[in-house]
Amino acid sequence: MELFNKEEASFETLLKRLLVVCESHSRYHGSSLDPMVKVGHEMRKISGYLRCILRKHAANHDDMSLTQSIVNSYKSLFKDAQILDLYHNLLFGCMHLLLDANMSYFRMDSQKLFAVLLFKVYYKLRDIFYVTNEVRLGSLISAFVYKFKSCYDFISCNSLKYGSVRDVISGEVSLINLPPIDSNKVINRAYYRLDVKKLAINNKLVEILELDNGEIAIFEVLSEKMPYTLQTIDNLFQSLALGNHDLMNVGRSLLFRPFRSGDLDLIRLDDSGAKLKVPINNSIVLRLTCKDPIQWQEYWKHVIRKLFDSTATKEYKRSGSKISQQVYVRSNNPDYTSPKRNDDMPISSVKISDTIHNGRTLHRSIPLPGSLSSLIETSNEYPDEESLSIMSERATVSEDSDLDTSLKDIESLSCEKLIELDKSIQVPLSPKYMDTPTLKNIRTASQTFSLESVSPELIESVASEIDDSESIISEDGKDKRDKDLFDPDIDFYKPTLYRRKSSSLLSIFSKNKKNLTIDIPKNHSRSLFSLPGNQQSVTPVSATPHDDNVDETYVSFPLSINTSGGAVYFENDSVKVSLWNGKSWVPLSKDMLCLSLILSGDNETLLIVYKDFEKEKCKLVVKLEPTWKYNRSTAQDVQLRIPSSDFKASVFGTLHDLTLSIRCAQAAKLVNVLQYQLQSSQTSSLSPSTTTGTLSTVSSSSCFSRNVTRSSTENSELANMKDSSEYISSSLLLSSVKVRQLRNM
């Protein structure tokens, strides 16, 4: 009896704690369009279920006799269908709140305790079922497990997010905005492990989606877990009961812009994955490892090869040109009769007429007198003068063949298989000589040819014309492969202005002279980034950085800063950062650095300068504050004036306010992001006591002045501005009406 009282008291305490959490949200009232109003409505219903359950437990405890065992007491309690219905409404109502796709804010931000208490109630009910073996209670628990597993997997696989998409194809690895992908266009999907050293991605679980247009999209699995089964779902319940609330961050987040055919270059294919690289920026290498080796071998290996292997793409295009020619001849020749069987279909070729300049019509294809390999060998043995007489002889194809390959199977064959198939066709070699066709025998430039009927010389000549644009692109890439993608020297981009020489005597005093130095006294400086009082400007002022003594030291990212659950506002992996030491600009590194503007888990905006996006190689970590000053000095330079108190970590001393110069190609975007974040932080930093000195009246129609009694007027003097004959003092009325009083002195 004492053990039952102890267990029952613990269970009632758990239910009461859950009731307190639900009642705290049930009091929410707001606009009918606010989704939290729906949360408050559901919480009120769950609170009602909990009160009824507590009353049922109290009544069962009072009716229990002193000699009754724990098993019998719980059996008598859960034989009541009403309490089973109450627990059903409780479990499924809480599950609906946690897994509603439209209430991600409730699921992620503030309801860790709600999920912990819910699954503690679930485990308590499961323990009671193990003791009592109550059938209806067991059915309730099984239904909850199955429904929670189905809803969790559904929202995890179908919630697609697009807030952190990088454009690696352009070489800048910048964040871009993309339209959402229609789920109806997804034809296949599989799980992989992704490694990208350049982007600090290590063994990340991703899901690749194949779209109906041939593209593939790589999505990050936010929960970092594979879909659960009924045997493994208990691991999720235990983690949530222990407070691991990160597992409720479900869904998929698109990492890169969807890749089309030729966007990546295939480096290597193995038994479980592939290694790909970006053609523009060879330092970005993607390593994909499929979680299902069987699925990789049967399907995905061919998809990756078809998309990114240049040799396979060319063979596929050649095979497609042959098939398209046959289809075109059939559709345009009314006298054409298709063979009865596929094995009777000959390998067609383009009929070359003796009169080149007369007709332009298509003729029915005449079969080759031999296999492709044998004809190529024969054509190399005889001169071109005998070609016209030899090509006039035709041979018939034997109707007896052992091949029974469909047209669809031929399209899917590789180059080696096609050569084997060609050699296996038994065709009598009736002509003794074979002519090599030349480019002059071709009727039109747009005519499609079968590669089995022409010699290698003709293939090269036609390919040189068809792939002319491709060759130009490849040659241009060869000429520029040794050049940097981004030249940090601003003089390279600055236009050169030429002025007509002036014959005026005043031109002698012109300041447009080379190597001109200007003395700037400290007390007459009008620059935005003026030096502090204890620093003196040294003349001449040089804006040229000195790379003689560059300190290549780094600091680690502060462990006290929480970066989980944050957002990325700006990223660039090709910036040069310099520090003004009072005399000249000192670069922080000889190499290009990476710059990021992120939102930490503590709701702080941080500016990070580091190498290769590695947290162990930071140059500086600064918290963004409204006191910063910024200026876009040139087209690609942004100067920042940062107080010393805002530095979280740096490789240099921060005794005084520092001036940094950031040079990057996205200077305009960086300025826009800085302006927006500084304005946002300035607005959010407004303290609640700022408007305590305002005037308050009962006659105000503001919604915040309702149910407020009349109070004494408090004046808040804003400024005292002195004029020649009077003072002006201002006060605020409800922080929006300004009262001005004029007093003659």
UniProtKB/Swiss-Prot annotation:
Biological processes per GO annotation: hexose catabolic process
Family to which the UniProt record says this protein belongs: Belongs to the UPF0508 family.
Protein name (database record): UPF0508 protein YJR030C
Organism phylogeny: Eukaryota, Fungi, Dikarya, Ascomycota, Saccharomycotina
